[in-house]
Amino acid sequence: MRRTGYAMMLLVAGTLLAGCADRGGPDQGASAPPTPLESGTTSPAPADPAGLIGSWSVAEADEGEGAILRLASDGARLFDRCGVWLGSWRADPNGLFVVGLFGLSGPDGTEGCALESTPGWLSRASGFRSNGDGRILVDDQGDQTARLLPGATPTAGPNLAPSEVEPPVVTDEVRRSFAPAVELPATLLPATRAGLVDRWVPIGGRAPKAYVELGADGGWSGSDGCNGTSGRWVAGPAGALLATTGPSTLVGCASVPVGSWLGDAWRAGLDGDVLVLLDARGGEIGRLRRA
């Protein structure tokens, strides 16, 4: 994707917000680091994903010093030396956290600023915990990738409206959107991160070319049968699954929206060899099998 402007980035605005659950109300007091259960998961711990909403100064991050991360109900934005990154994010009360960046508006030719070089400290982040008024981002082993300090003030550039840099508003509706997801039904075995890493295709055969591939590096790619898309994902205990989605083309064809399925999912369970994706209320979104 070329770094042009937000008009192109917003081509599929509907998918940008598919997982942008943002919530507010910082926790008080520092909590212990999450305990790794397996690669890519952390133990349940009291967490307030709504408390992530805000503009944060990035500290103690490899090549991230001085950046500002803004998390709001309309998505994620990272302000750094490269310009302004556009993306989406998700988090849950288990302390899971994931950001996917898919657009960059900034000066062409800045060294190390290709879209493919999303900052490593952010791409490695798969969880969060409170630290006083700040937040700590951690990787899948519970090791810190960055410290977030409150009170940052991003500057609006030529491609941003003033409202896009103002302190995000946390409504009751937004808070409710971060309520704990319904547990998996007893008939499903919780999917683990290791078990999810694979290429999956929707059951039914309506769109033979549709698939989603979950990578071990936390990235995913897929197609509804004729339109490609991608994002990032993280898995946790009890079948918790969060994924971000990025832009896609809009070619019409017989399709299955597997990317949207993934972006809407809060839990993943196995019915034998079949992967079942569920929404926050426990409703079934879709079923897939290994390719």
Model-based region annotation:
Residues 2-9, 18-291:
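Lipid interaction determinants
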